[in-house]
């Protein structure tokens, strides 16, 4: 229906500090507007600054990485500290406010060497929040339609069309009307409503009036808002975007007054950093800056369909911007997301030997289902993780055979066909596994959070509720790419308190504070689709990362780990135990039984405790048959036992823990033998073909090789061809370069089920067939299809290190890198996106980077750089022509052998 309107709404506003409008609905179609001019900012943190400096300048100092963090936290306030090698916003608030006299910061390392000097931006240039809307006309927004016509949508058929993501229905009605008014009610409702886009909409308006018991979400551009019962929402399209009446008030919100700011580059953020801050004749020094490990998250993603097709709803995996957004919420220096190709399992073998070809005979659900646990979690997710650890085989049941030495998670979407139909799984995380239904939003933040060791409602109200500035557990988030603060409260003014365990946080200027991801929280806006962790949780997350190793191609061991004492990353030895071993029953410690066990196992253990004890332990005579065998005694029982060995009798008392090794003539006593072996990847960060399945060393259950899984980024290990016997269980993989043979355990880890295997091979080797063999008998064979094209991985934060035969320059500003293999040059000049930018050098072990401050490497204006070289060390380098030149902003490049 078309009617004339005599309605007028107006919100005067300015770009940063704006006028606000109070709108009060009087009746359908009639509004009165009371304009209240208010150009003042709304400050979140109004507390008195506390001095953090030593010297004549007194100022409070904060930093912002994934969130704002204080240089010196208040007593009892659990806050994260700086993360190494991640850029940081420096925030300086002088105790005596001075917004005019310029402020500089001089950065020095632990040797007092100057890293650089920056001039800080004045308080008037403090970054905006993500709620700040750009493009608002200086003169304000006049909510008056261009002509007086409107269309009212109030039928079920018309309302049902509003869920079209293009907004085509609303668009069509706006063609001939200045206003479209939409009425929702019980029985006339849709969950999601989309406003259209297009230049022809300039000046058009949409109004929503809700009488529906269910809420709707209105999407407009990259923003969204909830429409609840009794609410009226008003929108106008201005300067190419929709504005909602009321949200413009948020342009006034800012963090605090009198704050000077500057971005510190990532390579400055290392232990030992100290800052000298100067304002006029005043100077203050910040020495004791706590900087922790350069933590790293490696996240694999895979979409699984079990006896049905994959769901194709793994939105996070497909959305590179989502990777970037989640990185902005956690205290790490690097986050890698590796995408696997979807996996469609047309049949499912269980570790019991049961083959499912139609459906799982049991019931499944969001939190239940045999295939959910055994396949999605244990076989696929842990299979991906364990293959990257070089752990070839593990127990067929359970999640305990996962070393979890690296912050490496395998996240999966999965659904399966059960007796009760096709069931979508989700809602769990921990131990390197993330089982997800919805992958954008709090479910992702929550389940990944369990992998960091976070439980539910961590530390109750004091740890799980975002707080106002004067309280502990208060912060704002920071998007270092968008240069925007993320307030810890919602954009809409609802005047709601945030309550937990009978304690409440009052709203800020009507805005409800959020909850932690582990406490029923939710994202604050579409600007970041993940839930902000509280400072309390972030500190726990940071400790998690600081206690994990990282894959490191430049480490002698293939891994590095943070040493809190030396404040450095040091080589870390990742070890696994592949020795065949068994713990003998205390009821079967006769000489003949022990000889039988030693013939089959490399290590035989005897473990006694109260209630599990026997008097005598008989060991067979050392001989050629048992040369190299290991016996380990761990006696924790209160009664003594007697060990008959080497023709003697030995008393074994409580606390005795030793090993004996046969040299063929004697059993030699020694400290407990560590049979673990170090594992170092052979290739780092390469496309991988991951092979998983089940095998039965006893040959009674049906072994099974699953279809290959293909990932864009993984780690491979050398095969075991040199130390395998034909009788050993093994996975044989045929490739273009020959056959690879990987050792598997020769005994069941669980007595009643098969073992599982999980092995990576380089996709580049073009594997064509996999064969399971035990005792020289073929258990199963699988033809392997070629890997699909287009698999990708993303890196957010610190760039990956250069490969062995590669030289790179990395933009200090963006973190993007430009790399060339040995023997290549940039051409006449570097690409436009990096030429002339300040960079640092990163070259591989066999590479040297040649840079010139001139095009085409001309006039011998060339400097040589090896390894990691920071910009400060590139500013005065002796060139081939004998001059000392600045190569920190190069124009051309070549990579040669070192």
Curated annotation (Swiss-Prot):
Gene3D superfamilies: 2.60.120.1230, 2.60.20.40
Localization terms from the record: Secreted
Active site: 447
Inducing stimuli: Up-regulated by the LEE (locus of enterocyte effacement)-encoded regulator ler.
Note on how the cofactor is bound: Binds 1 zinc ion per subunit. Does not contain structural calcium, which is often associated with other metalloproteases.
Domain named Peptidase M66: residues: 296-551
Alphabetically ordered keywords of this record: Hydrolase, Metal-binding, Metalloprotease, Plasmid, Protease, Secreted, Signal, Virulence, Zinc
Regulation: Inhibited by divalent cation chelators such as BPS and EDTA.
EC number: 3.4.24.-
InterPro entries in the cross-refs: Dictomallein, Peptidase_M66_dom, StcE_b-sandwich, StcE_C, TagA_dom
Purpose: Virulence factor that contributes to intimate adherence of enterohemorrhagic E.coli (EHEC) O157:H7 to host cells. Is able to cleave the secreted human mucin 7 (MUC7) and the glycoprotein 340 (DMBT1/GP340). Also cleaves human C1 inhibitor (SERPING1), a regulator of multiple inflammatory pathways, and binds and localizes it to bacterial and host cell surfaces, protecting them from complement-mediated lysis.
Protein name (record): Metalloprotease StcE
Taxonomic source organism: Escherichia coli O157:H7
């Amino acid at each position: 229906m078309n009617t004339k309107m005599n309605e007028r709404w107006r919100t005067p506003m300015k770009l940063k500090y704006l006028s606000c409008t109070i709108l009060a609905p009087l009746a359908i179609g009639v509004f009165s507007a009371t304009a209240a001019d208010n150009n003042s900012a709304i400050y979140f943190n109004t507390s008195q600054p506390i001095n953090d400096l030593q010297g004549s300048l007194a100022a409070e100092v904060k930093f912002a990485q994934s969130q704002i963090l204080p240089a010196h936290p208040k007593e009892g306030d659990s806050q994260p500290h700086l993360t190494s090698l991640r850029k940081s916003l420096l925030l300086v608030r002088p105790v005596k406010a001075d917004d005019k006299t310029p402020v500089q910061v001089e950065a020095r390392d632990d040797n007092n060497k100057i890293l650089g000097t920056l001039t800080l931006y004045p308080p008037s240039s403090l970054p905006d929040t993500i709620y700040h809307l750009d493009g608002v006309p200086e003169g304000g927004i006049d909510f008056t339609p261009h002509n007086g016509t409107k269309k009212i949508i109030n039928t079920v058929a018309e309302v049902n069309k509003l869920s079209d993501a293009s907004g085509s229905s609303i668009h069509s009605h706006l063609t001939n009307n200045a206003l479209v008014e939409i009425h929702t009610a019980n029985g006339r409702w849709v969950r999601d409503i989309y406003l259209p886009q297009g230049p022809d909409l300039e000046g058009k308006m949409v109004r929503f009036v809700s009488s529906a018991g269910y809420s709707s979400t209105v999407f407009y551009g990259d923003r969204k808002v909830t429409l609840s019962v009794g609410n009226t929402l008003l929108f106008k399209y201005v300067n190419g975007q929709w504005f909602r009446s009321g949200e413009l008030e948020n342009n006034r919100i800012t963090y605090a007054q009198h704050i000077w700011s500057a971005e510190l580059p990532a390579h400055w953020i290392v232990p030992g950093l100290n800052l000298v801050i100067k304002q006029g004749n005043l100077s203050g020094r910040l020495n004791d800056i706590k900087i922790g490990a350069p933590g790293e998250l490696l996240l694999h993603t895979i979409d699984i369909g079990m006896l049905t097709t994959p769901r194709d709803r793994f939105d996070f995996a497909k959305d590179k911007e989502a990777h970037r957004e989640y990185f902005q919420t956690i205290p790490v220096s690097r986050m890698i997301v590796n995408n696997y190709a979807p996996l469609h399992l047309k049949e499912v073998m269980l570790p019991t030997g049961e083959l499912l070809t139609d459906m799982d005979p049991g019931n499944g659900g969001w939190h239940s289902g045999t295939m959910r646990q055994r396949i999605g979690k244990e076989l696929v997710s842990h299979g991906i993780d364990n293959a990257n650890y070089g752990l070839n085989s593990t127990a067929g049941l359970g999640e305990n055979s996962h070393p979890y030495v690296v912050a490496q998670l395998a996240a999966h979407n999965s659904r399966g066909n059960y007796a009760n139909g096709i069931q979508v799984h989700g809602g769990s995380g921990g131990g390197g596994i993330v089982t997800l239904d919805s992958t954008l939003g709090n479910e992702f933040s929550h389940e990944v959070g369990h992998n960091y060791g976070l439980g539910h409602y961590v530390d109750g109200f004091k740890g799980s509720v975002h707080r106002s500035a004067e309280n502990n557990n208060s912060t704002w988030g920071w998007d270092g790419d968008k240069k925007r603060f993320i307030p810890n409260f919602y954009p809409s003014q609802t005047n709601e308190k945030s309550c937990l365990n009978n304690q409440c946080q009052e709203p800020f200027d009507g805005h409800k504070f959020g909850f932690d991801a582990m406490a029923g929280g939710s994202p604050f806006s579409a600007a970041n689709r993940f839930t902000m962790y509280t400072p309390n949780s972030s500190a726990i997350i940071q400790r998690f990362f600081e206690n994990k190793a990282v894959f490191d191609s430049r480490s002698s061991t293939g891994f590095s780990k943070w040493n809190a004492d030396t404040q450095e990353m040091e080589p870390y030895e990742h070890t696994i135990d592949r020795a065949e071993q068994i713990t003998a029953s205390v009821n079967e410690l006769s000489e003949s039984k022990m000889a039988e066990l030693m013939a089959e196992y490399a290590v035989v253990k005897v473990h006694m405790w109260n209630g599990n004890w026997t008097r005598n332990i008989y060991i067979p005579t050392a001989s050629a048959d048992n040369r190299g065998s290991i016996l380990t005694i761990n006696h924790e029982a209160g009664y003594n036992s007697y060990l008959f060995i080497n023709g003697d009798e030995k008393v074994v008392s409580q606390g005795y823990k030793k090993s004996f090794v046969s040299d063929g003539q004697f059993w030699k006593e020694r400290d407990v033998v560590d049979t673990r072996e170090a594992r170092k990847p052979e290739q780092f960060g390469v496309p991988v073909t991951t092979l998983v399945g089940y095998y039965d060393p006893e040959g009674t259950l049906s072994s099974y090789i699953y279809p290959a899984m293909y990932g864009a980024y993984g780690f491979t290990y050398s095969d075991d061809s040199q130390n395998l016997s034909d009788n050993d269980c093994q996975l044989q993989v045929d490739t273009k370069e020959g056959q690879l043979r990987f050792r598997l355990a020769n005994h069941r880890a669980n007595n009643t089920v098969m073992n599982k295997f999980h092995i990576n091979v380089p996709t580049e080797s073009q594997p064509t067939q996999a064969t399971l063999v035990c005792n020289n008998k073929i258990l199963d064979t699988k033809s392997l299809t070629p890997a699909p094209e287009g698999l990708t991985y993303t890196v957010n934060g610190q760039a990956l290190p250069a490969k062995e035969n590669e030289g790179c320059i990395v933009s200090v500003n963006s973190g993007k890198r430009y790399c060339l293999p040995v023997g290549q040059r940039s051409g006449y000049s570097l690409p436009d996106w990096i030429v002339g930018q300040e960079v640092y050098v990163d070259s591989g072990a066999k590479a040297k980077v040649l840079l010139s401050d001139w095009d085409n490497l001309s006039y011998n204006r060339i400097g040589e750089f090896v390894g990691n070289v920071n910009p400060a060390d590139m500013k005065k380098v002796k060139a081939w022509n004998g001059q000392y030149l600045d190569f920190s902003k190069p124009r051309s490049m070549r990579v040669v052998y070192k």
